[in-house]
């Protein structure tokens, strides 16, 4: 198992945890002195009280929690949010409220998932043409909405 260094910037912060044995993402919790209300149609930056040190060649992705998305229309507008291996600041989560009702975030609420994944940097090779494929330049919606 990969070891990732983590610092509690606030002693009240909760460490990320896997909710189940085979979970891909760890639940990330809010670390707040007072509740934050995310008004309908707005976004708020939520502190976690944590900083991490990822190994070179890895990133952490912050993703919405499916239950918050389904029940409250709460998501992350920059999902997946990327935490680079060289970032050492506090992990914060942008929550956006797509719903009609204000959404209150309290200390300890699980607000996002964190997935740690390998990444590879690339170097681009500029060419005049690209190889042909069956798909070609077919873009958004090119396969239609029909049944499987």
Swiss-Prot record:
<dbReference type="GO" id="GO:0004170">
    <property type="term" value="F:dUTP diphosphatase activity"/>
</dbReference>
<dbReference type="InterPro" id="IPR029054">
    <property type="entry name" value="dUTPase-like"/>
</dbReference>
<dbReference type="GO" id="GO:0046081">
    <property type="term" value="P:dUTP catabolic process"/>
</dbReference>
<comment type="function">
    <text>This enzyme is involved in nucleotide metabolism: it produces dUMP, the immediate precursor of thymidine nucleotides and it decreases the intracellular concentration of dUTP so that uracil cannot be incorporated into DNA.</text>
</comment>
<feature type="binding site">
    <location>
        <position position="78"/>
    </location>
    <ligand>
        <name>substrate</name>
    </ligand>
</feature>
<comment type="pathway">
    <text>Pyrimidine metabolism; dUMP biosynthesis; dUMP from dCTP (dUTP route): step 2/2.</text>
</comment>
<protein>
    <recommendedName>
        <fullName>Deoxyuridine 5'-triphosphate nucleotidohydrolase</fullName>
        <ecNumber>3.6.1.23</ecNumber>
    </recommendedName>
</protein>
<feature type="binding site">
    <location>
        <begin position="82"/>
        <end position="84"/>
    </location>
    <ligand>
        <name>substrate</name>
    </ligand>
</feature>
<keyword id="KW-0479">Metal-binding</keyword>
<dbReference type="GO" id="GO:0000287">
    <property type="term" value="F:magnesium ion binding"/>
</dbReference>
<dbReference type="InterPro" id="IPR036157">
    <property type="entry name" value="dUTPase-like_sf"/>
</dbReference>
<dbReference type="InterPro" id="IPR033704">
    <property type="entry name" value="dUTPase_trimeric"/>
</dbReference>
<dbReference type="GO" id="GO:0006226">
    <property type="term" value="P:dUMP biosynthetic process"/>
</dbReference>
<feature type="binding site">
    <location>
        <position position="92"/>
    </location>
    <ligand>
        <name>substrate</name>
    </ligand>
</feature>
<keyword id="KW-0546">Nucleotide metabolism</keyword>
<keyword id="KW-0460">Magnesium</keyword>
<feature type="binding site">
    <location>
        <begin position="65"/>
        <end position="67"/>
    </location>
    <ligand>
        <name>substrate</name>
    </ligand>
</feature>
<comment type="similarity">
    <text>Belongs to the dUTPase family.</text>
</comment>
<dbReference type="InterPro" id="IPR008181">
    <property type="entry name" value="dUTPase"/>
</dbReference>
<dbReference type="Pfam" id="PF00692">
    <property type="entry name" value="dUTPase"/>
</dbReference>
<keyword id="KW-0378">Hydrolase</keyword>
């Amino acid at each position: 198992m990969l070891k990732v260094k983590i610092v509690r910037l606030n002693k009240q912060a909760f460490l990320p945890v896997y909710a189940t044995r085979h979970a891909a993402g760890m639940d990330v919790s809010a670390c707040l002195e007072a509740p934050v209300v995310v008004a309908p149609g707005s976004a708020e930056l939520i502190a976690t009280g944590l900083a991490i040190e990822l190994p070179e060649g890895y990133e952490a992705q912050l993703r919405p929690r499916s239950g918050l998305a389904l029940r409250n229309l709460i998501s992350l507008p920059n999902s997946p949010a990327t935490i680079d291996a060289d970032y050492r600041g506090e992990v914060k989560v942008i929550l956006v409220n797509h719903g009609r009702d204000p959404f209150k975030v309290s200390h300890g609420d699980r607000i996002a998932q964190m997935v740690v994944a390998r990444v590879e940097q690339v170097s681009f090779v500029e060419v005049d043409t690209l190889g042909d494929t069956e798909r070609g330049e077919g873009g958004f919606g090119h396969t239609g909405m029909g049944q499987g």
